[in-house]
Swiss-Prot record:
It is a peripheral membrane protein. One of its GO terms (cellular component) is cell outer membrane. This is Putative outer membrane protein CT_569. It comes from Chlamydia trachomatis serovar D (strain ATCC VR-885 / DSM 19411 / UW-3/Cx). The keyword Manganese does not apply.
Length: 124
């Protein structure tokens, strides 16, 4: 009886290259899709920060101690001293690290809190 040696099958270089190429294509597609999701997440976080800043500043205005102009001028101190938020100065930054803008509306009876980045993203 003849003994036959079983030959071990190995992966060829071409097969390896095909697998690596497919992994690269799939990884690239996932990275491309995640970029849009990260941008949407930053916009959402910034909008939430704007809403919280607005709420805290309007609660201070509603207490009757300060006018709207004084509230806007002292926004950093108001947010730092507020029991409604832990790190008030961080709330005044958007997700990209830029300062939020706090202004009075055209009628002068309300506060507008916004980020230049978010406005630019929504326009373009």
């Amino acid at each position: 009886m003849k003994k036959t040696k079983k030959r071990k099958q190995s992966i060829t270089l071409v097969e390896m290259m095909v697998v690596i190429t497919l992994i690269g294509i799939i990884g690239g597609a996932l990275a491309f899709n995640m970029r849009g999701s990260l941008q949407k997440g930053k916009i959402f976080q910034t909008e939430q920060n704007c809403a919280r800043v607005y709420d805290v500043l309007m609660m201070e205005y509603a207490s009757g101690n300060l006018s709207l102009k004084e509230v806007i001028a002292n926004k950093e101190a108001i947010l730092e001293d507020s029991a409604w938020c832990k790190e008030g100065k961080k709330l005044l930054k958007d997700a990209w690290g830029e300062d939020l803008l706090v202004k009075m509306n055209d009628k002068g009876d309300d506060i507008v809190v916004f980020s230049k980045k978010v406005r630019n993203e929504q326009r373009g």
